[in-house]
Amino acid sequence: MDHKMKLTDEQQAILDGSRGETMAKVMETLVRYGELFGADEMVPVTSKYNHLVTSFGLKALAPVYALMDQLIDAGAVSAQKFSADPRPLDPNVPSNFLQNFVFNKFMYTKQDFYEGQLKKLGLMNDDAFTCTCYMDEVGNTPAMGDVLSWSESSAVVYANSVLGARCNRNSGIIDLMGSIVGYVPSFGFLKDEGRRASWIVEIKTTKKPEAQLLGSAIGMKVMEDVPYIRGLDRWLGGKLDDDAKTYLKDLGAATASNGAVGLYHVENITPEAVKYGESLIKDDARVYVIDDAELKRVYDSYPVIWKNKDAKPKLCFMGCPHMSLNQLISWTEKVEAALKAAGNERVVIPTVFTAAPGVLKAFEATPYAARLKKTGVITSYICPLMYMNNPLSTKMPVITSSNKLRTYTSARYYTDDEILTEITGGKK
């Protein structure tokens, strides 16, 4: 193929077919992809593991399965082991006969087949299904400066922002292809200039803002640009500890889904902001001030798309993206306290907390697991979004504190305190 990109001798040889026709097509796809975004070269993928966004065996993805078979047959498998987004099904999650019929007979009919393909291509292990692959309990945590070939938006924004890795918001399949050849096109967040901020976000709230609400406000304002966030460090204790990482996990997912943010900097907190400070800010950066009134305006702007806006919720999902271990522990305590205050022993709405399989195993090893189970809350490894994609689930009045789930489905957003009141039967 004709191309303008400067390739190394090895890269050009792969493109010319030195490693077979299939590998040449993979390289050609990446070169064409890179040139669309102005990439001038291909750079090595340096992370230990990859992460794939496509984890669900939808019947409609027949072309994907055919492509996967072609890659497997040609020996064009991933040069890295990889994790993948969450599984779409879990029998522990409440669903009726008709929902299960749609899930198993019309939607995810190829799940087992597709997981078999993933294993042949390089899946880390049977538990490597989560959108929060970067958690210690999962083991796919890139180092600062690592070049990645990921595509899951909430994982990309976390890796770029909280870990200081380098990754563009790639698409599904492109993520796998970068891992197969070991190179990705260099543009966007892989470049120093692409990581500079064109927005300054000033946090002037009177209390710690809800991560999912703050992330939503930032995402809708800056869209795909890079924000430099000031004033948030006072609410995060001035350090990047586990609680701060959990907060930024949820904030980032909301910026990425309510907008298209792939990288943000938090002054005095995130690694590049600590290292480079205000030099990350572009000279012509715009300013966005977020105070209590602005967060209320954003909250009030969310549409409620339930057929009956006053319907009693039939299900609550927490964990989009998947919850961390410290979230599971803290929410156990919150639910217990709220139930006691409400005079109830168990949640009054079926409630599901979702987390990575590895995180759930760690949680089960603590005394909190039995305490949470006693409240009636269910834990699961499921992807709530994949559950909500069922047309019959869409018709259900489902509540969540995830702005990502609100954006992509019919689920209704509530703040954490509102969720607690709803699921425990407290006074409104």
Task: Spell out what each predicted region is.
Residues 1-317, 321-428:
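Non-transmembrane, aqueous-exposed alpha-helical and coiled segments at domain scale
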